[in-house]
């Protein structure tokens, strides 16, 4: 099973930059999108062979997730947990026979870490949610998780220390998640690979210079580790400030 995750930074804009051609090229069983900034009624495009599920923020033109899938899920749910987490369209959970798929757009901690307190609450509650799902069947958790977990996961760790996405608190929460029975699929296959990034600032020619961050992930329940066929970052794909990440599972 081939799964793709991509923060498209506005799907309407990405549609004008080859999104449908990318979908044909990717030939994925499931495509998970973050930061769609689109409501379902605005989706005036054809994607034959895929069912489409949307979770939009209350605020127009903000956040949002989508799952496009060839296989009809057993169930689909939106958001999770407390009411505070249910207004920004950040999570879709699709249940398949072999696993739960959780597509997530994690809240950014913002400049001066002004939203860090909420981010910590989100991380704890989402980890509890994933662990609860994992008691029933394995979990595939993907998306823009807005954290570079280790120094190897960004080009300039020293100058970005305590910036949003590389604060001690954020990477500690990722460490805690992985210690709770989950595996970062890319690092499982490539523990020492450098220069592997999924997001680049639009400033300072960051993408040209590969001054990036790896903040987009596929994370799976530990018991799916032996099912991982490949985990890749398609850095050559443009259309957003992020690139797609890809997971192939033998399920």
Indicate residue ranges for each PLM-predicted region.
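N-terminal, active-site-proximal structural segment of metallo-dependent hydrolase catalytic domains
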Residues: 1-47, 51, 57-63, 78, ...
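Structured beta-strand-rich core segments of catalytic domains in phosphoester-bond hydrolases
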Residues: 37, 43-109
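Surface-exposed cleft-lining segments at the edges of enzyme active sites
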Residues: 81-82, 107-123, 158-162
């Amino acid at each position: 099973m081939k799964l793709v995750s991509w923060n498209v930074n506005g799907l309407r804009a990405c549609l004008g930059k080859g999104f449908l051609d990318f979908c044909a090229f990717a030939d994925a069983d499931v495509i998970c999108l973050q930061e769609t900034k689109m409501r379902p009624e605005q989706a005036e495009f054809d994607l034959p062979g895929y069912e489409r599920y949307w979770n939009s923020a209350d605020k127009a033109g903000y956040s949002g997730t989508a799952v496009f899938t060839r296989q009809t899920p057993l169930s689909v749910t939106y958001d999770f947990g407390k009411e505070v987490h249910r207004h920004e369209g950040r999570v879709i959970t699709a249940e398949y026979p072999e696993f739960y798929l959780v597509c997530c757009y994690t809240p950014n901690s913002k400049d001066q870490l002004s939203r860090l307190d909420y981010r910590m609450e989100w991380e704890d509650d989402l980890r509890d949610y994933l662990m609860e799902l994992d008691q029933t069947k394995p979990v595939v958790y993907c998306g823009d998780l807005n954290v570079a977990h280790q120094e190897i996961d960004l080009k300039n760790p020293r100058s970005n220390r305590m910036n949003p996405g590389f604060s001690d608190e954020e990477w500690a929460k990722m460490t805690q998640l992985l210690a709770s029975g989950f595996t970062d699929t890319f690092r499982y296959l490539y523990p020492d690979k450098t220069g592997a990034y999924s997001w680049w600032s639009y400033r300072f020619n960051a993408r040209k210079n590969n001054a990036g961050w790896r903040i987009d992930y596929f994370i799976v329940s530990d018991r799916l580790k032996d099912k991982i066929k490949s985990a890749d970052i398609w850095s050559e794909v443009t259309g957003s400030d992020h690139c797609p990440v890809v997971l192939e599972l033998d399920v």
